[in-house]
Regions:
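Local sequence-structure signature of Cys/Sec-based thiol-disulfide redox active-site neighborhoods
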Residues: 1-23, 27-32
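Thiol/selenol-based redox catalytic cores and closely related redox-interacting motifs
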Residues: 34-118
């Protein structure tokens, strides 16, 4: 079973959840605001995703903008970025879909289909 991590009020997350339900994909739901990802989880997900760490940031979020992360991220180390992401789930791009051997960040139907539809 995959883990589906999102913010329920996010419209992209709502579309992703509907897609999972419509395709009868079993998932474990987790509200990213109520249950913030831990530093260890973020390290594991980053490694498993193969993506640059900057892709894990919710660049359209108010918190990202208020912290001026657009200008700060280029000078931060991966450790500093991971620690920052672990402080608030609203900094993390969502939804996240996590399987045994993959992590998908954001909702792209084609990518999700390739990973979970048999």
């Amino acid at each position: 079973m995959v883990k589906f991590i999102c913010y329920p009020k996010c419209t992209t997350c709502q579309k992703a959840r509907k897609w999972l339900d419509d395709n009868k994909i079993e998932y474990e739901f987790r509200d990213i605001k109520l249950n913030n990802p831990t530093l260890d989880e973020l390290k594991e997900w980053h490694k498993k995703s193969g993506l640059p760490l900057k892709k894990f940031f919710n660049t359209s979020g108010l918190l990202y903008k208020s912290l001026d992360l657009k200008n700060k991220l280029p000078t931060m180390t991966d450790d500093d970025m991971l620690k920052l992401l672990a402080t608030d789930g609203m900094l993390v791009k969502r939804p996240l879909l996590i399987g045994d051997d993959f992590v998908l960040v954001g909702f792209k139907e084609g990518d999700w289909s390739a990973k979970v539809i048999k």
